[in-house]
Amino acid sequence: MIAEIISIGTELLHGDIVDTNSAYLAEKLTGCGIDVHYISTVGDNKQRLYKTLQQAVERADLIITTGGLGPTMDDLTREAISEITTCPLVMRPDLVIDIEGYFNHKRTTMTPNNLKQSYLPEGAIPINNPVGTAPGILLEKDNYIIISLPGVPREMKIMFEESVLPYIKKKNNLMIISKELHFIGIGESTLETKLEDIMDSMNPSLALLAGDGEVKLKITGKGRTKKKIENKISEIVKTVRNRVGEYIYGEDETSLPDEIGKLLSKRGVTIALAESCTGGLIGARITDIPGSSAYFKGGVIAYSNEVKINHLGVNKNTINKEGAVSPETAAEMASGVRQRLEADIGLSVTGIAGPEGGTDEKPVGLVYVGLAGIDGEVKTYKLNFKGDRNKNRWLTTQSAFYYLYRYLKFSFK
């Protein structure tokens, strides 16, 4: 079943309101095994709304609209649906009673224009609105189904979940299963190139989502039986792992700190942090994981040179000669925090997050990561970021976690 979602309202086109309804509906429909091929937005203009609906009924089996069901003059959805389906609007006495009852319950006066909401296209089924006055519309035609819901997210969601979702599940008896693979250390474009021949797969379908310094691959299969779907997904996962498995750090509901915590526990080792430009963000992400006290010794936020020297043992001459942002300083920070907190592994970051503080030699976004391993050997990594201050700090944590993850994953026998 192919679906189109239409959001109605001039305020959406002007950017006054963000359209969260479409994202919600797309996620729910996809979860039911329905293919959302189109999402449209149209203003409160009868002619343009009619054309949008006309296009939708020609290319989709299921059309869901949000907005335009209220009592005012710019609420035009009923009229447009009536015209496109050639079903005249008919007053429903039962809806008149419901609308009057709503205002009586609120002890407020009902203006006459509210009765506009009691009109539905002939043959349509009203969708109960338990939190508002505007009922939804469900109209089945020979080749398509139109469902209209209010634009207010609270009303739309409760009506969809209580009335529309059960109806759709009954109509579209497909099971859908998804699996997510999480990647670090490889960009979206490179990953797509390596998987190019399978990215166009229809069932299971593959979708890449990049952001926050990592990439997700969502594999979605649908069918009548769970076993067949899972087998198809497993074949894709096997292919992906054979090609780019070294960059996969986890599956489904997980995070990089979570997987690092599992590896630290599995290896039976502890870690300590020395953070400069991230200001404790790495430690915060580690301690977000329940049970992290088993492997996290603690950290030093060494923002000033004095703290680097006095609390981490960084040589004053190193800072004077090489600078606070240098591979030498990062190495001494990692080694120092490992020794002073008596941890097996020391991880450090020092850099220029911005927006000020950069030079031609050391620009904003320059970061060094230091990693002191269980044998005391220290490695450093140079990074250059181009974001704003917050993005640079976040990407620094991601990169530090990446090097730590690879060390824990591949340096132990």
Curated annotation (Swiss-Prot):
Its taxonomic path starts at:
Bacteria, Bacillati, Bacillota, Clostridia, Halanaerobiales
Source organism per entry reads Halothermothrix orenii (strain H 168 / OCM 544 / DSM 9562)
**In which family does this protein belong, per the annotation?**
Belongs to the CinA family.
**Cross-referenced PANTHER family:** NICOTINAMIDE-NUCLEOTIDE AMIDOHYDROLASE PNCC, NMN AMIDOHYDROLASE-LIKE PROTEIN YFAY
Q: Which domain of life is it from?
A: Bacteria
For this protein, the record's InterPro entries field holds: CinA, CinA-like_C, CinA_C, CinA_KH, Competence-induced_CinA, MoaB/Mog-like_dom_sf, MoaB/Mog_dom
Identification of the protein by name: Putative competence-damage inducible protein
